[in-house]
Amino acid sequence: MHWLASATQTSASIVSSSLLSAVDVSSSLTMSEYFQNTSLPGTANSRQFSLPVVSNAAFLTGSISNFSRASAPAISSAWLQPSASGTSFQPLMGSAYLYQHSSTTMLSGVTGQSHICTSAASYPGVFEWDSTASTVKKSSSLRDFTVTVIDQNTAVSSMSMTAQYYKTSDTNTMVPLYPSLSASLVQGTLTQIPNQQGHNLSLPCQIGSQVYYYNQGTLGPQLSCLQSYGSVSYTGYRASAHQPEMVMVLKEVQPTNVLPPVSTSGMYYSVSSQPITETSVQVMETSLGMDTSLGLQSPSQTFCLPQTPEFSKSFSSRNTQTLESNPSPELGDISITPVQSPTNLLTLSPAPSQEKNENENLDEIKTNLSKPLDVHQILIGNQDPPLLPVEIPDIHPLLACIDPLGQEEQPGSENANLRNKSLSLEDQGIFENGIESSSDLADITTWVEDTYLPPIFSSLQDLDQPESPSAKKAKDTSAIKVNQVQEKSCVIKGHSDQVRKNKHKASEPIQGAPKAKIQPKNPECLLEREVVVGSATVSNSASVNKAKHSSNKPHKAASSRISKTKSHGQEKTKGNRKNSSKKSEESKQSGKKVKVEEKQTIPNMKRKKNQPELSQKTLKKPRSSLGMHMLESVQVFHALGKKIDMKTGFSSSRTLGSSSNTQNRQPFPALKPWLDIQHEGKGPEKIQVKAQKLDGSAEKECTSPSHSELPPPGKVKLIPLPFLTLDQPQARHVSRRPNPLASRRPAVAYPARPDSTNSAQSNAVNPSRPAPTNTSLTGPATPAQPISAKATQPSSANPTQPTVPQSAASRPSAYKTSSCSSLQREPVSTAVTSLRSLPKPQNQFLIQDFSLQPRPWRKPTVPEPVMSTPITEEQRPEREAMKRKAQQERENAAKYTSLGKVQFFIERERDMEIAEYYGYTI
């Protein structure tokens, strides 16, 4: 399982090494740090330092987790180095993956040029930390770590990262869940601490961690022991859980056309098989191969990492790298392009396989490596998954071995790929959205999708953006230009900007499709990429999907937004009106909205259509059969204007009365056939009914113009029931036990809508009576208007009449009057102030003084109701037609009430309440 492959100078690529497959690594995350090295004036130096960190299972017992970056969830993590051209993911022995791409590290967030001394090279800046934490961890936690990169030029980049790890109960492994990185790259001069190598050494310290520096430059090729170059110990606090163990091995080999020693014979890593009370990081330097290893040291146990000869070999093939020893079938041929500066080869995981070559080339290597890797300083927070602050002084050999990734001037697909990859890393959207910046990134994208890395990159992106957004943009632009040929790299750029913006927008509350529309600046690119901008994050995915839909279906989005916005705060009924009004407004804005408005207005129009004929009914007519029955029992007005005997008139009153009442309630369009006729003086119709009521009430000076009209000679005269006070009857609406209830309920049910339409009508019809009363009264509204007028007028105009005539007019008028008055209490206060004094107008049915209210129908002394003469034969067809019409209107009204569809259960409940209160039996 040990694979270490290193290419020659020409094929400078680092092969992932799988150290001791026993390591349990669920997945690896890669973060890249990017910052500009401003130390050299006139040159934008972006250096990337790669620090693979792998956390072992809770116990690194005799095994070191290997480094692998796999497109699939990596069992091991791999140290990846850029190759001159071509990118390939191939699993090594199924546990390690070899990744090579041109001019950039696999997941380098950005590529930059680093000119140090006289050599221009870029460090592959990759942080890889294994998501697997010690199995003992019990709870998810946020981990903060600081990464400090210090180069010889004293350019300092510090970032603070926070990663959240979620512990799965089954696997007992800590899995990083969308680690978020909040960091700011700070460039500053670091106090130079010269070490024996003459490099600047910065020792970032973190409580609870130990950092050990080992300089093995003095050691022979056989690193049997580690010489302590220097150690700074920070006592760690006891942790109930194991610290995720991490091992970093940096090995740099500078071959000269010969196979360089891959590594020394052995490396010792101290790890704890027990909960790590103290976490220590050892950085070992060796001039031999710049072999640097980082290991967690816990007081409990150390184990030696055996290195097998077959573990690694280096090859001098320029364009391809072949694993000569134990090549895995998956490995196949890995295309590796020569690095421009093939002097040094950086490899991870030492393997002593070529002792001979090492010995032979040891002098050469030492000579070439005049400056060994000074220090990799890693700070490990206790219990922190391998999120490490890293300090790397200038490493010329490493720079030499690494192909300058950041050189934008370098033309060719290498730079294109590099920029694409950097863009892909840069672009949060790319990882998060699973966008493949290029064919080279296909595997990367898959890998990223598999891992939880995207948020980190997004945060890194954010870090990078503040640092040098312009440089990145330039890179993005140039890379995109270079890569336009490749994999629609233009999409990448658009995504980089769009994704960021979209991501931010997505993260922002999606205020609706309009934003979503705005978000996808390049919807074509998004579609081409088959990448949903929001797919990066769950929340973002929804927003992005909305954005896509909005962009793809702006019309739908607009209509949906319209309907949604309309419907949100509105009830269906009010919402319908408001929606219709909004629609009318929005219809001006958009035809789609107009369509929506039309849809919504259609039901309204239907209502109106019904209303012109039936809508009044709908508003005023009782919405339940009980209410209708009560209305019938009380209102016995013939549609032709004659009052029919209570019993005989029930059906007609039901049809006529309810229809007329409804019509009165209904806005004039509904009333036009009836109300207009009535207002115009058609005695036989509702107005006649009103006149009939007004026979008593008209005598009482009906103020309403229509009511003021006296009923034609055949009309029934309404005799108002005697009430203790006008206030009481109106307050009670009780005089007609069925009708007041029904009327009240309809009035209450309908008053809101009728108020607007019927209020005008009722006002026009009954100026004395408030419109809301008519509106509110469903069935009795029409009679109620005259009645209210009667009651008001009689009280004012004919104080003597109101009681007796009303009692005479009795039940229809009284019922309507009571219902109207109850309704009027709320709306009618203007019309009848005294009547409105009634308590609790909000109580539709329950009137406090109802029990005190005389019930004339129970009194034998009630004046005989005026009997209407039978209609003539000539009037019979008209009456039948009116009855049919009223029935039809009632049916329609039953379908559509002022609040919309009839809520039968609610109406039934109200009917039951009314009946129970008044002693009715339903």
From Swiss-Prot:
One family name in Pfam for this protein: DUF4629
Q: Where is the composition biased (Basic residues)?
A: 546-567
Mark out the compositionally biased spans (Polar residues). Answer: 755-779, 790-824
Q: Which domain of life is it from?
A: Eukaryota
InterPro entries this protein is in?
A: C2orf78-like, DUF4629
In Swiss-Prot or TrEMBL terms, this protein is called Uncharacterized protein C2orf78
UniProt biased composition (Low complexity): 651-660
Instruction: Map out region (Disordered) in residue numbers.
Output: 459-522, 539-627, 649-668, 692-835, 856-879
Question: Which UniProt keywords are given for this protein, alphabetically ordered?
Answer: Coiled coil
User: Looking at the keywords, is Phosphoprotein present?
Assistant: no
Which residue spans adopt a coiled-coil conformation according to this UniProt entry?
A: 872-899
Task: State where composition is biased (Basic and acidic residues).
Answer: 582-600, 692-702
